[in-house]
């Protein structure tokens, strides 16, 4: 069949006029069809297959229809793939019969470029591929599998690997043939039994580089479902990984982003990761055998030879690679501890069960010591033998220590791959510096596993590795490097060693291949098939992995001062780590995240010490790292930190001081640790007092992350992922007089009437009404005039109490008053305080009336382990003192008015500024695309935040449409800081609108 024939068939059966171009394929005829009509889809793929494969084609169609239905029923953010869609014929059929015992299908063409169009791919693309396979597997896990579905003899089905062994002799190259035979045999004998214990599902099974469609850096589709099988999902990931490998020297490192990306879309289990490396090798071996089989049958089919040159090289590289190290790398990339036995080894050593001897100079605890800093930032540290000797003599030290996990600048030469992206610089042992000839002792009972003279420059020199076992027989090792050559003479493999036996002496510098006399002592939970060449220095970008393989040996040395330098990872590696060890429900600011390492006043500084004006973090109420607040915490922490079951003046004095800022009768204080806790306790107080549960809340409000508080936070329960409004909650429209339900001079009274209507509809006794005095997550909404006073009156008339959430806006931030509720001339029954109270330290409080506090005395003790501890109370008192004594409330009023006045002036020439609102330094600037329609400028707002970051200003946004700049800086901002913001805002809006 040629292109003209294909076009005629498409026109006849589908009524679509197209021009066709043939595409390569292994078993099918494929044509890319471009419509000559201006209506309908522009491009298609026409697939022609043998009628003998009808049952398999029907299965493929069922999968495609299922995926199309799945995509239409879930949020696009949960399934971002665009899979081909079946086109029905003029007779309503998705599968048509053709002459010569053939079947035809027409599918929509997925636009984009193929993975194979690019020779190399970056980490983002690899992660996107992994995510795509994971999303597809997650969707297909719900596909109902009928008996016999996609069940046929199929060489590409890993579960049928045994059938390939009889064809291995077709592989021409003898060396490749034996590697392939060994790989497939190991799969049959060791991997297939493990797969049989795993759940099976439909998998795509063909994520090769010609079946992956990309748009920019994102994989948007996996096409060609001709190889679908029912198997454990890890088999499909192995296929994609095999084709995704590009790094010839370190292929596994190159695909870690792919594995991590899959895990983030569809979390992998430990048993799946244990078989991934053998399955990758099996897929490559399978490809080599299948190519040999098919080439013998069709020697002219060039498609069959694609990737084979690459795979014959790759199978050799992977055959030489460590299965353990590859397994550990996959685990670490998915957030698991690299070596699954490392935890047991560490716990056994720390248990007190084994007898542990000092490695040098017993009793080591009493030996005079000093520490050397060889980190990359260290300058002038002694490194030569003479320098070290002088430094130790001057310090009166008999022993000098070089730390574990120290990122050093002393490793040079080919051994350390200095020109590689995985250059090794992080020390994995503890160095024990002492004169040559100093005795070295075995730390634990064991046997000699290995010994050698590693004589390459800056290597170990003479080295001994001892093998030990935990009580459960788990092996681990201790390594002693830089020894004297005579130390190796009496050794033999398997020689028994007892803890405390002298096993060596420290070598001279010439024996230690360039290092000053010392012993490198290392603890290892695996030798990862490296023997005496096991890394004593790790690449920084795989440090979490190597900390598992080679834990801190101080659990053996027991140096009270500690030995861990905690080498600092690069920002990109921290981002990767964060994705797998912290919940991805935690968001990050900015498209390209920034690592912040310190703060001072109104500024934050990144890892290159670049300053950023912080207009976002109202937590740092009196300025980042305020010296008075820091000092208060340090001094009290050095003295005492305990709980409130003991008398301590700090907690009592601070409670009195905090209550003195409140109007009567608010004078009873409860301490907690966060704003969420404060609001949860406020609910308990209200319920204890009213014996009711009904709640009134403002729309779009957020009051915290605790379950009870999510229930009264429409910002959470009414948005994506939320469970909807609970029965005991009624939502009042946000009293927004700019673009809300009611506007004008009487808007406040109309919103109060809305509250009355919700109250009447409640159908149960009212417990409380909770609100912020400026609604932050709604877009820094200043409540319409008169609303709050009228609302409080209605609530109290109904028997409820009024809760003022001051977590964000309290303690002088609103400028004209110390507390936000004072802006409205009301006095609440309960006040909750959070973010500003500790200037970054976790302290929060609830202040209420004696009457409500009395109602809480129901026989159940209130105790909060950390709430009101002396350190927190001392910090809180210092923050309050700074606010009052440095006039920060007045500064908030002055700077806030200056900022808002200037932005309002700016709005006269920049019509994207729809509204400027707030009080003091709690401000919202709403951006719109049209002043008349008030259409939210969501994209502009996001672009402006990125623009401002590049100009050294941190901004963020809020509101239902994410189009309101929220401005809530530390109260210490100065006019020059505001001027910087105004300049950036003007430039950004001018450039971006």
Residue ranges and their predicted role:
Residues 442-487:
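Zn2+-dependent peptidoglycan hydrolase active-site motif and core
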Residues 2-11, 145, 161-205, 215:
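An alpha-helical support segment within catalytic cores of ATP-dependent transferases
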């Amino acid at each position: 069949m040629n292109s003209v024939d294909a076009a005629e068939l498409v026109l006849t059966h589908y009524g679509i006029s197209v021009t066709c171009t043939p595409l390569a394929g292994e078993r099918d005829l494929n044509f890319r069809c471009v419509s000559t009509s201006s209506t309908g889809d522009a491009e298609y793929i026409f697939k022609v297959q043998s009628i003998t494969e009808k049952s398999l084609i029907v299965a493929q169609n069922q999968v495609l229809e299922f995926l199309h239905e799945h995509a239409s029923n879930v949020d696009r953010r949960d399934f971002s793939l665009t899979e081909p869609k079946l086109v029905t014929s003029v007779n309503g059929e998705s599968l048509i019969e053709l002459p010569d015992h053939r079947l035809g299908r027409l599918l929509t063409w997925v636009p984009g470029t193929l993975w194979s169009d690019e020779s190399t791919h970056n980490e983002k693309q690899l992660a996107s591929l992994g995510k795509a396979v994971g999303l597809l597997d997650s969707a297909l896990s719900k596909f109902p599998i009928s008996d016999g579905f996609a069940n046929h003899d199929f060489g590409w089905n890993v579960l049928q690997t045994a059938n390939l062994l009889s064809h291995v002799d077709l592989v021409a190259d003898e060396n490749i043939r034996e590697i392939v035979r060994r790989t497939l045999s190991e799969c049959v004998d060791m991997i297939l039994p493990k797969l049989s214990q795993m759940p099976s599902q439909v998998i795509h099974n063909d994520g090769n580089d010609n079946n992956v469609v990309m748009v920019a850096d994102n994989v948007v589709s996996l096409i060609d479902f001709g190889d679908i099988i029912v198997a454990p999902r890890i088999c499909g990931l192995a296929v994609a990984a095999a084709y995704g490998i590009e790094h010839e020297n370190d292929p596994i490192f190159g695909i870690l982003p792919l594995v991590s990306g899959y895990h983030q879309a569809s979390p992998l289990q430990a048993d799946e990761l244990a078989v991934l490396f053998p399955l990758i090798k099996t897929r490559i071996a399978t490809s080599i055998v299948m190519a040999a089989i098919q080439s013998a049958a069709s020697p002219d089919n060039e498609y069959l030879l694609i990737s084979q040159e690459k795979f014959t090289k790759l199978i050799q590289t992977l055959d030489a690679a460590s299965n353990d190290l590859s397994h550990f790398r996959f685990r670490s990339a998915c957030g698991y501890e690299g070596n699954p036995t490392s935890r047991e080894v560490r716990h056994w050593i720390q248990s007190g069960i084994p007898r542990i001897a000092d490695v040098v100079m017993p009793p080591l605890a009493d030996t005079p010591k000093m520490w050397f800093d060889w980190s990359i930032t260290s300058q002038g540290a002694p490194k030569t033998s003479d320098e070290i000797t002088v430094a130790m003599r001057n310090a009166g030290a008999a022993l000098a220590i070089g730390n574990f996990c120290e990122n050093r600048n002393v490793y040079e030469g080919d051994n350390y791959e200095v020109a590689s992206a995985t250059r090794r610089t992080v020390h994995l042992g503890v160095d024990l510096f002492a004169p040559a000839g100093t005795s070295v002792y075995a730390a634990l009972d064991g046997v000699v596993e290995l010994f050698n003279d590693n004589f390459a420059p800056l290597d170990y020199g003479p080295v001994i590795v001892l093998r030990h076992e935990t009580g459960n027989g788990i092996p681990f090792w201790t390594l002693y490097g830089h020894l004297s050559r005579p130390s190796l003479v009496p050794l033999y493999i398997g020689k028994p060693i007892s803890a405390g036996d002298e096993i060596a002496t420290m070598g001279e510098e010439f024996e230690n291949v360039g290092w000053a006399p010392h012993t490198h002592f290392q603890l290892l939970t695996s030798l990862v098939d490296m023997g005496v060449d096991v890394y004593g220095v790790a690449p920084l970008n795989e440090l979490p992995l190597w900390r598992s393989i080679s834990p801190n040996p101080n659990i053996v040395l027991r140096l009270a001062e500690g030995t861990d330098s905690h080498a600092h990872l690069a920002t990109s590696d921290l981002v990767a780590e964060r994705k797998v060890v912290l919940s991805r429900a935690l968001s990050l600011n900015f498209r390209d995240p920034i690592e912040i390492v310190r703060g001072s006043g109104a500024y934050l500084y990144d890892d290159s010490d670049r300053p950023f004006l912080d207009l976002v973090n109202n937590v740092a109420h009196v300025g980042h790292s305020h010296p008075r607040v820091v000092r208060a915490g340090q001094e009290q922490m050095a003295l005492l930190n305990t709980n409130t079951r003991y008398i301590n003046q700090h907690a009592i004095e601070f409670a009195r001081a905090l209550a003195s800022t409140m109007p009567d009768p608010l004078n009873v204080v409860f301490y907690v640790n966060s704003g969420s806790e404060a609001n949860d306790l406020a609910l308990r107080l209200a319920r204890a007092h009213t014996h009711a549960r009904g709640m009134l809340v403002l729309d779009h409000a957020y009051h915290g992350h605790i379950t009870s508080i999510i229930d009264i936070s429409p910002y959470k329960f009414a948005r994506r992922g939320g469970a909807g409004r609970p029965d005991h909650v009624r939502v009042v429209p946000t009293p927004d007089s700019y673009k809300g339900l009611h506007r004008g001079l009487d808007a406040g009274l109309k919103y109060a009437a809305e509250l009355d209507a919700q109250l009447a509809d409640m159908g149960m006794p009212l417990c409380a009404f909770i609100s912020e005095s400026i609604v932050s997550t709604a877009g820094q909404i200043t409540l319409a005039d008169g609303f709050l006073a009228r609302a409080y009156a209605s609530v109290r008339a109904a028997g409820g109490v009024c809760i003022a959430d001051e977590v964000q806006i309290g303690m002088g931030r609103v400028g004209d008053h110390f507390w936000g509720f004072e802006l409205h001339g009301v006095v609440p029954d309960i006040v909750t305080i959070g973010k500003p109270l500790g200037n970054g330290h976790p302290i929060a409080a609830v202040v209420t009336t004696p009457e409500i506090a009395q109602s809480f005395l129901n026989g159940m003790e209130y105790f909060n382990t950390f709430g009101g501890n002396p350190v927190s109370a001392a910090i809180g008192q210092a923050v309050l003192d700074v606010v009052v004594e440095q006039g920060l409330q007045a500064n908030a009023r002055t700077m806030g008015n200056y900022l808002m006045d200037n932005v309002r002036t700016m709005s006269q020439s920049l019509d994207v500024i729809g509204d400027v609102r707030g009080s003091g330094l709690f401000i919202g600037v709403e951006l719109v695309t049209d002043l008349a329609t008030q259409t939210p400028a969501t994209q502009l707002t996001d672009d402006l935040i990125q623009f401002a970051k590049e100009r050294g200003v941190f901004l963020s946004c809020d509101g239902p449409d994410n189009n309101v700049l929220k401005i809530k800086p530390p109260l210490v901002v100065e006019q020059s800081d505001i001027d910087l913001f105004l300049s950036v805002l003007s430039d950004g809006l001018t450039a971006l609108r």
